[in-house]
Amino acid sequence: MKVHLLKSKIHNAIVTSGDLEYEGSITIDCELLEKADMIPNEKVLVVNNNNGERFETYIINGVRGSRVIQLNGAAARCALPGDEIIIMTFCEIDAEESREFKPMVLIVDRNNNPKRRHRIGEEDEQLD
């Protein structure tokens, strides 16, 4: 049997901009993607901590070091610049493997600088 689990998340990211004219997606600084164990084109669930909105989209690589978290297309209507969001990816694995699987959590500051990360159930790794 397969189960769906949290694979990784970027916690408390701040939306930096939006582009309604773009076809869709969320643009994320590629350095943040690497630290959070996420990849371009991966499906994400985004939760807006300011208004409770939840939506799905996919990732586009942003410029390294830019700290960009930009919502594109219709997603730009779901959060405004300055809103705090959580960006999550999920995976499907065998139920047996799920007992050992530990999602990656990247925590960022108000400027989207990576502060620390950890696999759930393990010690934090300080990044600043």
Curated annotation (Swiss-Prot):
Active site per the UniProt annotation: 25 (schiff-base intermediate with substrate), 58 (proton donor)
CC per GO annotation: cytosol
Keywords associated with the record: Autocatalytic cleavage, Cytoplasm, Decarboxylase, Lyase, Pantothenate biosynthesis, Pyruvate, Schiff base, Zymogen
InterPro entries documented for this protein: Asp_de-COase-like_dom_sf, Asp_decarbox
Entry-annotated residues carrying Pyruvic acid (Ser): 25
Pathway assignment: Cofactor biosynthesis; (R)-pantothenate biosynthesis; beta-alanine from L-aspartate: step 1/1
Cofactor: pyruvate
Cofactor note: Binds 1 pyruvoyl group covalently per subunit.
One BP term from GO: pantothenate biosynthetic process
Keyword Hydrolase: no
Main location: cytoplasm
Cellular location(s): Cytoplasm
Pfam families (alphabetical): Asp_decarbox (PF02261)
GO terms assigned for molecular function: aspartate 1-decarboxylase activity
Enzyme Commission (EC) number: 4.1.1.11
Annotated positions binding substrate: 57, 73-75
The protein's assembly and partners: Heterooctamer of four alpha and four beta subunits.
Function (record text): Catalyzes the pyruvoyl-dependent decarboxylation of aspartate to produce beta-alanine.
NCBIfam families from the UniProt entry: panD
The name this protein goes by in its record: Aspartate 1-decarboxylase
UniProt organism field: Chlorobium luteolum (strain DSM 273 / BCRC 81028 / 2530) (Pelodictyon luteolum)
The gene coding this protein: panD
